[in-house]
Design a protein with these regions (language model features):
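Phosphate/pyrophosphate-binding loops at sites that engage ATP/ADP/AMP, CoA/4′-phosphopantetheine
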Residues: 69-83, 189-196, 311-322
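Glycine-rich phosphate-binding/hydrolytic loop that grips phosphoryl groups
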Residues: 332, 354-398
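Glycine-rich beta-strand-to-loop/alpha-helix junction loops that act as flexible
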Residues: 10, 88-92, 207, 325-333
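Glycine-rich phosphate-binding loop of actin/hexokinase-like ATP-binding domains
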Residues: 149-252
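Glycine-rich phosphate-binding loops at beta-strand->alpha-helix junctions
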Residues: 322-345
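Short glycine-rich, Thr/Ser-proximal phosphate-binding strand/loop in the N-terminal lobe
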Residues: 4, 13-58, 227
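Adenine-nucleotide phosphate-binding core of ATP-dependent small-molecule kinases
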Residues: 264, 271-275, 282-317
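Short beta-strand-loop/turn "lid" adjacent to the catalytic site in phosphate-handling enzymes
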Residues: 71-121, 142, 148-157
């Protein structure tokens, strides 16, 4: 039995789960929030209990120390030597990594270089990794890349129709994101269907505040909606997704704004928030739809339109589809959003959906299509943390 910790760090947060492997038992989970702000918060769940404490967390090293102290203080581990490995989520690994890897100086250097493509994520990942390395110097560390699963895409899927030198000189191409989630949902759906993942054609829909859709043929990614960065693809909570590039410099001229200003508009003020004028939270948007708010209704229609355009294109690229799986915040919990999407696709794809069942399913595995549906439709809650733990155990030989 080995204890390994899965780590998912952001610029101001640190989420964790401690697993007992190979049973995959979650011993504890939680997060540190508002790191670097005047007052932070630390939450930990264990033995059916949940504790939240507000306290200053000036940096990730302090967050890691608080976490490790809590593990022994609460008796979750007798001593920190019981932890044999740490797996870290890395948002951007570019084309350099097609699988998870044990961390060494060269790996660390490459991840740092890719920070230009993920300035909010990769630097924070490295700060957190170094904090764990300092506090737990005798354990192995593994990097698990959001981009790795997508490295099987063919050139026609990952290349952009821009000057070729942009690709050779500046690495401009589609990398995708949420790969660990898409990989888990792909394999788990195959298990639920009783099928070999290497014989299935599937479309996985990771619909959260950030959202991406992936076409998977025989267990390998054929295409994915996010692009060079997580700004590309479908409409999201605050991100615009794919738009006519002319909009960017046209509006920069009109508004007299800087590139940083435009980055804020596209990443933080667009998507559901931008269209609804209400919120980036789909629950608030649904409340507006239920109340008959015109912009709320438009937001729902626009989101549905963007999703089905991608799913439809992937259907043709795959040739046929055995299953469509919904996951992440909206995908797992928003039955109204799922219903709008499925009703928009049912005639074209030959879907037969149990909408009464769909309305009752929130955050649990379920087949919501009927036996006569040409494509099975599943809800499969994602579990990126367990994938990180599995890869950590495998690569460290625990």
């Amino acid at each position: 039995m080995s204890k390994v910790i899965s780590v998912n760090s952001g610029s101001s947060s640190l989420k964790f789960q401690l697993f007992d492997m190979p049973s995959e038992t979650v011993l504890t989970s939680g997060q540190a929030e508002r790191i670097g702000q005047q007052m932070g918060a630390f939450t930990i769940k264990y033995n059916g209990k949940k504790e939240t404490e507000e306290l200053p967390i000036p940096n990730h090293k302090v967050a890691v120390d608080i976490l490790l102290n809590k593990l022994t203080e609460l008796g979750i581990v007798e001593n920190l030597d019981e932890i044999k490995g740490a797996g870290h989520r890395i948002v951007q690994g570019g084309s350099s990594f097609d699988q998870s890897v044990v961390v060494d100086e060269e790996v660390e250097k490459i991840v740092e270089e890719y920070g230009e493509l993920a300035p909010l994520h990769n630097p924070a990942h490295l700060v957190c990794y170094r904090a764990f390395k300092e506090s737990l110097p005798n354990i192995g560390h593994v990097f698990v890349f959001d981009t790795a699963f997508h490295q099987t895409m063919p050139e026609e899927s990952y290349m952009f129709p821009v000057p070729y030198e942009w690709y050779t000189d500046y690495k401009i191409r589609r990398y995708g994101a949420h790969g660990t989630s898409h990989q888990y949902v792909n394999r788990r759906t195959a298990e639920l269907m009783g099928k070999d993942v290497n014989t299935l054609n599937m479309i996985t829909c990771h619909l959260g505040n950030g959202a991406s859709i992936t076409a998977i043929k025989n267990g390998k990614v054929l295409n994915t909606s996010m692009g060079l960065t997580p700004l590309g693809g479908i409409m999201m909570g605050t991100r615009c997704g794919d738009i006519d590039p002319t909009v960017v410099y046209y509006m920069m001229k009109k508004l007299g704004c800087t590139p940083d200003d435009m980055d804020t508009f596209l990443n933080k003020k667009s998507g559901m928030l931008g269209i609804s004028g209400i919120s980036s939270d789909a629950r608030d948007v649904q409340a507006a739809i239920d109340a008959g708010d015109p912009r709320g209704i438009l937001t729902g229609k626009l989101y549905t339109n963007r999703v089905i355009n991608v799913v439809g294109g992937y259907y043709f690229q795959l040739g046929h589809v055995d299953a469509i799986a919904f996951t992440a915040g909206l995908g797992e919990n928003d039955d109204a959003c799922r219903e709008r999407i499925l009703k928009a696709m049912e005639e074209a794809l030959g879907l037969s959906i149990d909408y009464e069942l769909n309305a009752t399913i929130h955050g649990k595995e379920c087949l919501i299509s009927k036996p006569d549906s040409k494509v099975q439709v599943w809800i499969v809650p994602t579990n990126e943390e367990v994938v990180i733990a599995r890869d950590t155990v495998r690569l460290l030989g625990l």
